[in-house]
């Protein structure tokens, strides 16, 4: 990886956009070591999503930059993500879950006017049932979103915001400013 002083301006602008603060207090962002072999320049963030103090989802967002461009990317900057979340078992059985989970990403990007091209990815849903020495806890279900896309502008702030919106949807967080019924309400009993 090249030294920071030698970073191309397009990469530096994209990194600056990804260093914007998280739009929600439930989403904790942290810079992590980026993969070194995927592109000449790379930057990475990890995210932890908390609900009532418990981790309910997590992910990584990796920015790749190849000044020479990359034919498959349709550009010289690429964003790559992996997001995972534990689900309620009944949600994991929903046949529409993959399509809905994909729209969490595309809607999040659209909501923040994050223009892109060459988007692609996979949605994986798994259910685990424990047996033998591991028996006891109820079955668990997990969702995994792997995706990548090419921003059409160097400023990645809108892409960060769209990705955070997808994280919030994946984690089942209500929209900002909306409380779920039964939460944050005072009892009306004397």
Language model feature labels by segment:
Residues 1-35:
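Short, extreme N-terminal leader segments that mark the start of a protein/domain
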Residues 44-84:
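A glycine-rich, hydrophobic loop/mini-helix early in the fold
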Residues 74-89, 139-148:
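Glycine-rich, often proline-containing surface loops adjacent to acidic residues and nearby aromatics
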Residues 95-133:
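Short, internal acidic amphipathic alpha-helical interface segments
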Residues 60-65, 126-136, 140-146:
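Aromatic/basic-lined ligand-recognition segments
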Residues 24, 33, 52, 144-146, ...:
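Interaction-mediating elements
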Residues 119-135, 177-190:
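Short, highly charged C-terminal tails/helix-capping segments
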